[in-house]
Regions:
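Non-catalytic DNA-recognition/assembly elements of restriction-modification systems
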Residues: 2-48, 167, 171-179, 186-215
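Short, solvent-exposed loop/turn positions at domain surfaces
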Residues: 1, 83-84, 154, 193
Length: 215
């Protein structure tokens, strides 16, 4: 329980650092230039049906993206999932954004290549003015959620389209500052990994003891 609390606190630390460095996006308290989506990123519609070529690549369905944190869990390969429909190609340069039920806030940062469900968009930040980690955190923020949820409330199955994402604008701080924030997030992620590993070790020990005494 304590370790789970530690993980939650580390997530809060990142959010607090975001506001500290970039201000409140809603009021744009630091007076950054407001920039349109297509000036700092693009939706990369590079799709494939070549399942032989990508057979051993990871296949990311939207169920593999944890809500809120964007952690990638429980995914399998393209071959294991028996993929039959067109999928988007992504790389470690992309953000994977689930366009279904945007209130679940599924924004992932893959560190590998693979294919993702057509229910998600691979988003490619413009490296000249936008850091990938910064953009992912901006997309997980209330600022982006408040914008995107106004469209999805109209349907039974809430879904976001390209046009709606393309209509998004946000304050864009200097790239050097975004990069500083990104370095901070990476350091926190390393700490999270350490906590996560100790959680998994504890779980294994618990199972072994249960087996020994009650198996």
């Amino acid at each position: 329980f304590l370790r789970k609390q530690q993980l939650a606190k580390l997530d809060e630390l990142v959010k607090a650092r975001f506001v500290e460095m970039f201000g409140d996006f809603k009021s744009n308290s630091k007076g950054w230039s407001i920039v349109k989506f297509d000036e700092f990123a693009q939706i990369d519609g590079n799709m494939t049906t070549d399942y032989k070529k990508y057979a051993d690549y990871p296949h990311i369905g939207i169920d593999s993206i944890e809500k809120g944190t964007g952690a990638l869990k429980g995914y399998r390969t393209v071959k294991e999932d028996g993929v039959v429909s067109g999928k988007y190609i992504f790389t470690p340069q992309h953000i994977i954004y689930s366009k279904i039920r945007p209130n679940l806030n599924k924004v992932a940062l893959p560190d590998f290549e693979g294919l993702c469900s057509a229910d998600a968009y691979p988003i490619l930040p413009n490296p000249k003015n936008c850091n990938r980690i910064f953009l992912a955190l901006a997309m997980r923020s209330d600022y982006f959620l408040d914008y995107i949820l106004q469209f999805s409330a109209r349907t039974n199955l809430p879904k976001v389209n390209r046009k709606e994402i393309a209509g998004f604008s946000m304050p864009l701080p200097p790239l050097s500052l975004q990069n500083d924030f990104s370095t901070f997030v990476e350091r926190v992620d390393q700490q999270k990994q350490t906590v996560q590993q100790s959680l998994e070790k504890l779980e294994l020990m618990k199972k072994a003891l249960m087996q020994e005494y009650f198996g």
